[in-house]
Amino acid sequence: MKNIDVQQLTNQFPLVQSLIALEPVTWFNPKASTLAVGLPYVGLDGSDVADASARLARFAPYMCEAFPETRASKGILESEIVAIPAMQATLNTRYGVEVTGKLLLKKDSHLPISGSIKARGGIYEVLTHAEQLAIKAGLLCEEDDYRKLFSEEFRQFFGQYSIAVGSTGNLGMSIGIMSAKLGFTVTVHMSADAREWKKRKLREHGVIVVEYAEDYGVAVEQGRKEAERDPNCFFIDDENSRTLFLGYSVAGERVKTQFDQMGIKVDAEHPLFVYLPCGVGGGPGGVAFGLKLAFGDNVHCLFAEPTHSPCMLLGVHTGLHDQISVQDLGIDNLTAADGLAVGRASGFVGRAMERLLDGFYTLSDQEMYDLLGLLARDEQIKLEPSALAGMPGPWRIAADREWQTERGFDAATLARATHLVWATGGGMVPAEEMEKYLATAEI
């Protein structure tokens, strides 16, 4: 990694001074381009997403058997989209600027199995690995009924292998629960930010939890090292995994189908804005990629980060990507948004997606808590703090007339817009933990 000359960096990029001061910032990305220009840099395309979608369909009968809570959705993990008009009215007043389009919430917070967006990528990567092992051993072919995997024979087969991952919490939950269900020995390396209840839940599923006093980067590094020592151990690399990324990307076509069913139009006259909380970047990056493939240049994605962990904004803004961490600037990477407590962004995601992302913004922990309290009060929806990071996004856009003009969004177009806030987690937060969150809100 480079030695960072902070003075030189702030001279070149004045915005970095605001990041160091922990001020909430909004930055619209001048590199943002069309899908045609940006797509080649990703190194993946629609056929890769179709392949991921087909794999999830093959596993759907197995999922119904292994997780009865998925039977209602026929073994496919998907979350609902709901309108939140009371919250919209409250925030129009709170922020003193009016968002005129339609405000919707994507409830990945309530996905089955692990209650977060990470159920998409984490579970998909475990299923992909299991399928490859079983096919290679001659125990499975793609035409089979995958319910056969839900058997003692396969549990014993997968029991010869292990899976490891480093996580701040939610990814570990998804990978841990899925791997243990299949029969793998699974170890989750948890950073200091990880919540106790998440560790407890994993241990209840027979997952080995290794705890660290350091942050996410250390947990990942230790997990990687341990996996290297065991030829039968597969390490799921949140920082660089294209498989995880593709697991998230399937969300794009799913949203398109949901919008069709809801009668929501997306085109040049009816733009779609999507606000995604960002940690290391794999989840929001994969979802944004899928949305771009589904809606093309009519969808505009913004990433949201805590003021104490603005790793992706920092990496893309300076062009240094994973060659810089927030700690290099003296930012502490300590935030209540445990899922977003990442100091160094994924270099793969930053470089792949920097031309397909319209903007980035940061918000304080207290703002996340306040929004958490307001959403619970106004819409009776309870989320964890990090899931609220996307909520101020529409107002950041509404407040920036210059960017609207530059991008050709007039008042009439914005009134026809749809704003989709991606709620990334919180559906499985224990009641006593949720009470603490709500008590921290100043509303």
Swiss-Prot record:
Its cofactor is pyridoxal 5'-phosphate. The keyword Ligase does not apply. InterPro entries: D_Ser_am_lyase, Ser/Thr_Dehydratase, Ser/Thr_deHydtase_PyrdxlP-BS, TrpB-like_PALP, TrpB-like_PALP_sf. It catalyses: D-serine = pyruvate + NH4(+). Its EC number is 4.3.1.18. One of its GO terms (molecular function) is hydro-lyase activity. The keyword Amino-acid biosynthesis does not apply. One of its GO terms (biological process) is D-serine catabolic process. The modification N6-(pyridoxal phosphate)lysine is found at residue 118. It holds the Pfam family PALP. Keywords: Lyase, Pyridoxal phosphate. It is an enzyme of class 4 (lyase). Belongs to the serine/threonine dehydratase family. DsdA subfamily. PANTHER family: D-SERINE DEHYDRATASE, THREONINE DEHYDRATASE, MITOCHONDRIAL-RELATED. NCBIfam families: D_Ser_am_lyase, PRK02991.1. HAMAP family: D_Ser_dehydrat. This is Probable D-serine dehydratase. The lineage of its organism: Bacteria, Pseudomonadati, Pseudomonadota, Gammaproteobacteria, Aeromonadales. The gene is dsdA.
